[in-house]
């Protein structure tokens, strides 16, 4: 009997869990929601869900036997035993209202993830940036070591063709979402914090101290024999470490890191470095991802794997053969246009620090290329809160095509839109950005902008990802 079968049997022995047969997801098309739904459908639960449109996540779930309903309707929850809700769903959603009227339990995504983690050895990855890549790297190392983990990732793991998988071992590797503080529901055995910056501040009442305390509380959900893995290069991580009453393993480029990277060198898409660990020989590695920020993500994976006595051969092979994640510096191809050959890369980063890391990786790997960025800001509140940082970072490309803000359901905020950002960047004087009023217009603008040898980077967390794939299918608008 596999561990997965044991967990199913154990749940069936709990009287309370025997009542749960039908689980309904409101917002099932999101990567995090869809990932949990995929694990549960493979565990034998009847899964249904709703969303406003189909996508690759819903298509996969349908192929696995889940029922997906387009649109939100009160009768969709009629036979559900529990309703799982995405943080993006408004409380006025008809399915939420109907579930309350029927007294059907409503839980957040993280609560259901915590239930999956209850009987497993959980590894939870938190932090403002790098969660998806770090989670993917850890899952890949464990898979290479034949540990066959269950994983739930916020992006598409290319090697698996999915963002979630039900494994047969006791391991569950998952992202921990701090955006709504719901990661406090999790009780893992190992917790990773990549970094801490001011983001999602509405959740924390605009109080950065409250955000930091919440991360400390997250680490204190570890058992006393658990391990906190923290990037010591991050200033806030270093600041909160004295408050953490658990064993800590640090990683970074810093000399005092327990797992330290040395001799970093980037050649195109690959990063080369040496890792130094206590009581182990130095290990030369090639990571099939660009940029120092991705080396930090890899160090987290190395730290977690080393604590679990995974062999170095598996670590080396997993990092060298890593096939990447969807929309994380994703190389979409080289295109022969009327203006010459252009390289297209798509990236999800939408915080100034993430955008800067992507720019640095592009500069380091392709120093001779002109960097053209098509950037779509994500959320008016983030644009407002980090406005000056966006102006500074976006000024560092050679040519900027700036789209309007992808609202993600927020109301517009005066002075925090794409036009205002464009004006401020122009006033800074380093570059003369081009405002693109509608995503549909980007393809018509590109032929007048692109030059031979350019690297075109589509950047942002909104629908620019779908737009980049459309550009790839139409030869960057030259057809």
UniProtKB/Swiss-Prot annotation:
Question: Does the keyword Cell division belong to this entry?
Answer: yes
Key words of the record: ATP-binding, Cell cycle, Cell division, Cell shape, Cell wall biogenesis/degradation, Cytoplasm, Ligase, Nucleotide-binding, Peptidoglycan synthesis
The kind of enzyme this is, by top-level EC class, is ligase
| An annotated Gene Ontology molecular function | ATP binding
GO CC, sorted alphabetically, is: cytoplasm
Q: Which residues bind ATP?
A: 127-133
Q: Which Pfam families match?
A: Mur_ligase, Mur_ligase_C, Mur_ligase_M
Q: What processes in GO biological process is this protein linked to?
A: cell division; cell wall organization; peptidoglycan biosynthetic process; regulation of cell shape
Chief subcellular location = cytoplasm
Instruction: Cite the InterPro entries for this sequence.
Output: Mur-like_cat_sf, Mur_ligase_C, Mur_ligase_C_dom_sf, Mur_ligase_cen, Mur_ligase_N, MurCDEF_pg_biosynth, UDP-N-AcMur_Ala_ligase_MurC
Cellular location(s): Cytoplasm
| Similarity comment | Belongs to the MurCDEF family.
Function, as annotated, reads: Cell wall formation.
Q: What is this protein called?
A: UDP-N-acetylmuramate--L-alanine ligase
